[in-house]
Amino acid sequence: MPELAKSAPAPKKGSKKAVTKAQKKDGKKRKRSRKESYSIYVYKVLKQVHPDTGISSKAMGIMNSFVNDIFERIANEASRLAHYNKRSTITSREIQTSVRLLLPGELAKHAVSEGTKAVTKYTSAK
Protein backbone atom coordinates (compact mmCIF):
# COMPACT_ATOMS: atom_id res chain seq x y z
CA MET A 1 0.00 0.00 0.00
CA PRO A 2 1.56 3.36 -1.01
CA GLU A 3 2.19 5.87 1.76
CA LEU A 4 0.15 9.02 1.63
CA ALA A 5 2.15 12.24 1.53
CA LYS A 6 1.85 13.98 4.89
CA SER A 7 0.85 17.58 4.55
CA ALA A 8 1.25 20.25 7.20
CA PRO A 9 -1.96 21.05 9.04
CA ALA A 10 -3.78 24.05 7.64
CA PRO A 11 -2.93 27.22 9.58
CA LYS A 12 -5.70 28.66 11.70
CA LYS A 13 -7.44 31.78 10.48
CA GLY A 14 -5.42 34.83 11.45
CA SER A 15 -2.34 32.74 12.22
CA LYS A 16 0.99 34.52 11.95
CA LYS A 17 2.73 31.35 10.73
CA ALA A 18 0.80 31.52 7.47
CA VAL A 19 2.57 34.78 6.63
CA THR A 20 6.07 33.59 7.57
CA LYS A 21 5.78 30.38 5.55
CA ALA A 22 4.79 32.19 2.34
CA GLN A 23 6.93 30.94 -0.54
CA LYS A 24 7.82 32.41 -3.91
CA LYS A 25 7.45 30.45 -7.15
CA ASP A 26 11.14 29.48 -7.15
CA GLY A 27 10.75 27.81 -3.73
CA LYS A 28 12.59 30.40 -1.63
CA LYS A 29 10.99 31.67 1.58
CA ARG A 30 9.96 35.29 1.42
CA LYS A 31 11.44 37.51 4.13
CA ARG A 32 8.93 39.47 6.18
CA SER A 33 9.60 43.18 6.02
CA ARG A 34 10.66 44.61 9.37
CA LYS A 35 8.39 47.14 11.00
CA GLU A 36 10.35 49.76 12.91
CA SER A 37 8.85 50.94 16.16
CA TYR A 38 9.74 52.48 19.50
CA SER A 39 8.14 49.63 21.46
CA ILE A 40 11.34 48.28 23.05
CA TYR A 41 12.29 51.77 24.22
CA VAL A 42 8.80 52.50 25.56
CA TYR A 43 8.95 49.17 27.42
CA LYS A 44 12.39 49.98 28.92
CA VAL A 45 11.16 53.37 30.17
CA LEU A 46 7.99 51.78 31.57
CA LYS A 47 10.09 49.29 33.54
CA GLN A 48 12.28 52.11 34.91
CA VAL A 49 9.22 54.06 36.09
CA HIS A 50 6.86 51.20 37.07
CA PRO A 51 8.75 47.87 37.25
CA ASP A 52 5.65 45.80 38.05
CA THR A 53 3.39 47.26 35.33
CA GLY A 54 2.79 45.80 31.86
CA ILE A 55 1.43 47.31 28.66
CA SER A 56 -1.05 45.94 26.11
CA SER A 57 -0.22 45.80 22.41
CA LYS A 58 -3.00 48.33 21.71
CA ALA A 59 -1.52 50.76 24.26
CA MET A 60 1.94 50.14 22.79
CA GLY A 61 0.57 51.03 19.35
CA ILE A 62 -0.82 54.27 20.75
CA MET A 63 2.52 55.09 22.41
CA ASN A 64 4.33 54.34 19.15
CA SER A 65 2.00 56.70 17.25
CA PHE A 66 2.53 59.35 19.93
CA VAL A 67 6.34 59.15 19.72
CA ASN A 68 6.23 59.27 15.90
CA ASP A 69 3.91 62.29 16.02
CA ILE A 70 6.07 64.23 18.50
CA PHE A 71 9.22 63.33 16.55
CA GLU A 72 7.67 64.64 13.33
CA ARG A 73 6.48 67.87 14.98
CA ILE A 74 9.91 68.56 16.52
CA ALA A 75 11.68 67.77 13.22
CA ASN A 76 9.36 70.07 11.25
CA GLU A 77 9.75 72.92 13.74
CA ALA A 78 13.55 72.49 13.82
CA SER A 79 13.62 72.50 10.01
CA ARG A 80 11.57 75.70 9.95
CA LEU A 81 13.90 77.36 12.49
CA ALA A 82 16.99 76.37 10.49
CA HIS A 83 15.38 77.79 7.33
CA TYR A 84 14.47 81.08 9.06
CA ASN A 85 18.06 81.51 10.23
CA LYS A 86 19.48 80.54 6.80
CA ARG A 87 21.16 77.43 8.20
CA SER A 88 21.44 74.13 6.36
CA THR A 89 22.07 72.04 9.49
CA ILE A 90 19.69 71.14 12.30
CA THR A 91 21.71 71.20 15.53
CA SER A 92 20.80 70.42 19.13
CA ARG A 93 20.05 74.13 19.51
CA GLU A 94 17.23 73.96 16.93
CA ILE A 95 15.87 70.81 18.56
CA GLN A 96 15.94 72.45 22.00
CA THR A 97 14.15 75.56 20.72
CA SER A 98 11.57 73.39 18.94
CA VAL A 99 10.88 71.49 22.17
CA ARG A 100 10.46 74.78 24.05
CA LEU A 101 8.00 76.01 21.41
CA LEU A 102 5.98 72.79 21.14
CA LEU A 103 5.72 71.51 24.71
CA PRO A 104 3.88 73.39 27.47
CA GLY A 105 5.63 74.90 30.52
CA GLU A 106 7.02 72.38 32.99
CA LEU A 107 7.00 69.56 30.43
CA ALA A 108 9.31 71.59 28.16
CA LYS A 109 11.71 72.26 31.04
CA HIS A 110 11.93 68.56 31.91
CA ALA A 111 12.33 67.57 28.25
CA VAL A 112 15.14 70.11 27.73
CA SER A 113 17.00 68.96 30.86
CA GLU A 114 16.68 65.27 29.85
CA GLY A 115 17.79 66.09 26.31
CA THR A 116 20.80 68.05 27.56
CA LYS A 117 21.69 65.14 29.83
CA ALA A 118 21.45 62.68 26.91
CA VAL A 119 23.62 64.85 24.61
CA THR A 120 26.23 65.27 27.38
CA LYS A 121 26.29 61.51 27.97
CA TYR A 122 26.65 60.87 24.22
CA THR A 123 29.50 63.37 23.70
CA SER A 124 31.40 62.15 26.77
CA ALA A 125 31.18 58.54 25.53
CA LYS A 126 32.91 59.40 22.21
Curated annotation (Swiss-Prot):
Residue numbers of N6,N6-dimethyllysine PTMs: K58
GO cellular component, one term: nucleosome
Keyword match Aminoacyl-tRNA synthetase: no
Location of N6-lactoyllysine modifications: K6, K12, K16, K17, K21, K24, K44, K86, K109, K117, K121
Modified residues annotated as N6-crotonyllysine in this record: K6, K12, K13, K16, K17, K21, K24, K35
Post-translational modification: Monoubiquitination at Lys-35 (H2BK34Ub) by the MSL1/MSL2 dimer is required for histone H3 'Lys-4' (H3K4me) and 'Lys-79' (H3K79me) methylation and transcription activation at specific gene loci, such as HOXA9 and MEIS1 loci. Similarly, monoubiquitination at Lys-121 (H2BK120Ub) by the RNF20/40 complex gives a specific tag for epigenetic transcriptional activation and is also prerequisite for histone H3 'Lys-4' and 'Lys-79' methylation. It also functions cooperatively with the FACT dimer to stimulate elongation by RNA polymerase II. Phosphorylated on Ser-15 (H2BS14ph) by STK4/MST1 during apoptosis; which facilitates apoptotic chromatin condensation. Also phosphorylated on Ser-15 in response to DNA double strand breaks (DSBs), and in correlation with somatic hypermutation and immunoglobulin class-switch recombination. Phosphorylation at Ser-37 (H2BS36ph) by AMPK in response to stress promotes transcription.
Record's function text: Core component of nucleosome. Nucleosomes wrap and compact DNA into chromatin, limiting DNA accessibility to the cellular machineries which require DNA as a template. Histones thereby play a central role in transcription regulation, DNA repair, DNA replication and chromosomal stability. DNA accessibility is regulated via a complex set of post-translational modifications of histones, also called histone code, and nucleosome remodeling.
Family of this protein: Belongs to the histone H2B family.
Protein name: Histone H2B type 2-E
